[in-house]
Amino acid sequence: MDLRMSVEDREEFLAGLHVGILGVDDPRDGGGPLLVPLWYSYRPGGPVTIATGRQSLKARLIRGAGRFSLCAQDESAPYRYVSVEGPVVGVEDPLPRAEQEALARRYLDAETAAAYLAANQEQLVDDILIRMRPERWRTADFSAFAEEFES
């Protein structure tokens, strides 16, 4: 049984509302990759966009590696995930206000987004926007697999 998603399905899934898990090589002390949850945005055919502090560990490691991975998943059955990996294709410093607002509104209702932006105004001036072009896609949709057990 092929669990891979079609191109259209994987792009639609990645564009949906999920907290992403960012992965980037962390060569310090011979450790494994840095994996952290974060907000992201994606439009089919475009880059994955993340925001992070200019001097954050994430930003420093991404600058060093020149690429990163991002995984989004459904945490309830039927389980699905999309994982993308690719090179950084753009950095905007500072993070444009319109992008800050769009990202907050993606994850929060309008009132909560406005409160979040106001409360974090000082921190957000230190944020940058990083864009990654997905080159490698890994996907799985366990819907059909789950249907076999239901019938």
Predicted segment positions?
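Charged, gly/pro-rich active-site loop segments
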Residues: 1-5, 82-151
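Short secondary-structure boundary/capping segments
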Residues: 11-12, 40, 60, 120-122
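Short beta-strand segments
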Residues: 17-54, 62, 68-72, 81-84
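A generic structural signal for nonpolar/aromatic side chains embedded in well-ordered alpha-helices
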Residues: 14, 61-62, 103, 132
